[in-house]
């Protein structure tokens, strides 16, 4: 629904404020409320350093070329990725911890609305050009409410690399969380499931070193109050 130009146009008339939050992992904490257009928010302490290392070690043997929505290999995304499920004995506890933090922030606790966690590795020169995590015009519109990604919790598993920031292109904001920290942003409207221009973002090219991140996606459910 929103391309890069539409996103830029929207934000020329929008007042956008970066929301920096230092949140505890207390499950009793109320859901993070963000006003339209759902500015990205920093999230501190999602994982420990040891958990980041373990998740990387678990994902490494199964890495494959990253794909875009529709299971397509594209020059727009040149990283490698692996999927990790909450049921896996060696790393499932880490997936569950990431999901729990995403649930705490979004107010969504239904397991069926969480995808597997996607672990991504970016080597030198690798990137993910500006894109939306939600379903775009090429998707099956009839299935869109079921498959659309409502929110993204992006966790940085390393921070010892050069460049490679997450760039929210429409508002000109670059973020580079510390290892174990993340950024939360909404991809779709809570009521309609339509894509939000605020979520347009890119993984900029890594200059040197290796960047590892983990994506946790919460899907849109038109019957739910928040997602």
Q: PLM features: what roles do these ranges have?
A:
Residues 1-227:
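Fe(II)/2-oxoglutarate oxygenase catalytic core
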